[in-house]
Curated annotation (Swiss-Prot):
Binding site for Mn(2+): K200, H219, D256
Residues that span the membrane, as ranges: none
Keyword field: ATP-binding, Cytoplasm, Decarboxylase, Gluconeogenesis, Lyase, Manganese, Metal-binding, Nucleotide-binding
Binding site for substrate: R61, Y194, K200, R322
Pfam family, one: PEPCK_ATP
Record-stated family: Belongs to the phosphoenolpyruvate carboxykinase (ATP) family.
Cofactor(s), by name: Mn(2+)
Catalytic activity: oxaloacetate + ATP = phosphoenolpyruvate + ADP + CO2
Name listed for the protein in its UniProt record: Phosphoenolpyruvate carboxykinase (ATP)
Cross-referenced Gene3D superfamilies: 3.90.228.20, Phosphoenolpyruvate Carboxykinase, domain 1 (3.40.449.10), Phosphoenolpyruvate Carboxykinase, domain 2 (2.170.8.10)
Pathway: Carbohydrate biosynthesis; gluconeogenesis
Length: 537
């Protein structure tokens, strides 16, 4: 086996069982990975030098194909939200991965998951594709070159899209598979070319290990103001985590995954993974610039045949087009990936029913209620099979697919942290106003940014609030520079009766979803629920 690159010779691929490989390239940088990727026909170049790859059948994660080994060490797993396989099935899968790798050229990256040295996890990723190696090198945190000589991984991932699982032999659903063995700290990914599976496997692993060490893992973006006032933004895909945290007046910590521990907030990653459908220089100049340069990786973005300029408006391959780029491509990004304890927690919801206010102040009990609810709404075009009506999505802790432990573990941690650090909590609707999807319009991003700025700089503490009659939270009645009618959603609807009907329907959806948590939360959290009786008056 021919090996190239800087590595720990005393702890190589043989420690993982890999043998009889054709070649193994260790810790290559972007120029070399570009070269291998283009030579193999894996990807093409954009006009400005981004590496562009298609992921074929899978243009997003496949949560139904994700499995975890069930054994004595994982009895604390949240099995209601996770699928299991036996240790024997995983071992058969592992052996078949090892056999499948024989004779192939693989790429290895030694990386850190986590910017805090106390809590980071040393991660080794073997990939079949050069562009996947560049992707994960971009998304995780790269060690100093001198650290590679002695690097010993705690977590090992092997990612081979050409592998096909056998459902009968391996105990899985299809030929596509993501399998995690927490006891052995191994992740096996096969069948999918979608690179995001790798990064989310690291996130899932950190979600499993960190709570026991006093760190709350979070599916959120984070930034910090000039006075050291950190803000975190929870939200599901498409709600604005990446967009709203990229603020030229604040330092970006990260756009997707963070831990909140004894010394503050830290990024799990060293890169960003932005949705880039309809990306424009005018609306998101920082992300646009980062996506149009050497070192960026574009997934499923259509290029003009002649000019090779990306057409970010073209969703013909998928609405889930993506751009991966190093965090330092954002001019005001943190170089440490760390920040003080948050002063503000923001929960983002893209409410396609158009009844949530653009911003609301949450009590600590309401914050836990909305965190466990994890609400947003999907509309046609974001996923296959959606009709013309909005579909509510409740993804607990704003990250249900990545939670190995019971949601109450994360909810209780958040509540304690909010209390310990006297954090202000906000719910922000980045969805629709003036009617639901199809009738109303998208909440203007200028309005959202103005309200967020007022929340983060303390201006909203000095305004008058009303209590929302449907949801019970506090809503500002006026704010300089923001049209007052937009602050109360009913004023933006022509049909007030239809608004009332829609608002009460959404309240009912919240209540129905939260029923499964009622036995696990305190009375004040149950009391923080939207009140159907009040809403029905």
């Amino acid at each position: 086996m021919q090996e190239t690159g800087i590595r720990n010779g005393a702890f190589g691929a043989d420690k993982f069982g890999l043998k009889n490989l054709k070649q193994l390239h260790w810790n290559l940088g972007a120029p070399q990975l570009y070269q291998y990727s283009l030579a193999a026909g894996e990807a093409t170049l954009s006009a400005d030098g981004a590496l562009c790859a298609d992921t074929g059948e899978f243009t997003g994660r496949s949560p139904k194909d994700k499995f975890t080994v069930r054994d004595a060490s994982t009895e604390k797993m949240w099995w209601a939200g996770n699928q299991s396989i036996t240790p024997e099935q995983f071992e058969a899968l592992y052996q078949d991965f090892i056999k499948h790798a024989e004779g192939k050229t693989l790429f290895a990256q030694d990386l850190y998951g986590g910017a805090d040295p106390t809590f980071r996890i040393k991660t080794r990723v073997f990939t079949e594709l050069a562009w996947h190696s560049l992707f994960i090198r971009t998304l995780l945190i790269r060690p100093e070159t001198i650290e590679l000589d002695t690097f010993v991984p705690e977590l090992t991932i092997i990612d081979m899209p050409s592998f096909r699982a056998d459902p009968m032999r391996h105990g899985v659903r299809s030929q596509n598979v993501v399998a995690i063995d927490f006891a052995r700290k191994i992740v096996l990914i096969g069948g999918s070319y979608y690179a995001g599976e790798m990064k989310k496997s690291v996130f899932t692993t950190l979600n499993y290990y960190l709570p026991a060490r006093g760190v709350m893992p979070m599916h959120c973006s984070a930034n910090v103001g000039p006075k050291g006032d950190t803000a975190i933004f929870f939200g599901l895909s498409g709600t604005g985590k990446t967009t709203l945290s990229a603020d030229p007046n604040r330092t970006l910590i990260g756009d997707d995954e963070h831990g909140w521990g004894p010394s503050g907030v830290f990024n799990f990653e060293g890169g960003c993974y932005a949705k880039c459908i309809k990306l424009s220089q005018e609306a998101e100049p920082q992300i646009f610039a980062a996506s149009n340069r050497f070192g960026a990786v574009l997934e499923n973005v259509v290029l003009d045949e002649d000019s090779r300029v990306p057409d970010f408006d073209d969703g013909s391959k998928t609405e889930n087009t993506r751009s991966a780029y190093p965090l330092d491509y954002i001019p005001n990004a943190s170089r440490t990936g760390r920040a003080p304890h948050p002063k503000n927690v923001v929960m983002l919801a893209a409410d396609a029913f158009g009844v949530l206010p653009p911003i609301a102040k949450l009590s600590p009990a309401q914050a836990m209620y909305h965190f466990l609810s994890g609400y947003t709404a999907k509309v046609a075009g974001t996923e296959r099979g959606l009709g013309s009506e909005p579909q509510p999505e409740f993804s607990t802790c704003f990250g249900s697919p990545f939670l190995p432990l019971d949601p109450s573990v994360y909810g209780n941690m958040l509540r304690q942290l909010i209390a310990d650090h006297n954090v202000d909590c906000w719910l922000v609707n980045t969805g629709w106003t003036g009617g639901k999807y199809g009738t109303g319009s998208r909440m203007p991003i200028k309005v959202t940014r103005a309200l967020l700025t007022a929340a983060l700089d303390g201006s909203l503490r000095n305004v008058e609030f009303r209590t929302d009659k449907y949801f019970g939270f506090a809503v500002p009645t006026a704010l300089p520079g923001v049209p007052s009618e937009i602050l109360d959603p009913v004023n933006t609807w022509k049909d007030k009766v239809e608004f009332d009907k829609t608002a009460r329907a959404l309240v009912g959806m919240f209540q129905k979803n939260f029923a499964k948590f009622e036995a696990q939360v305190d009375a004040d959290v149950r009391a923080a629920a939207p009140d159907v009786k009040l809403a029905a008056e």
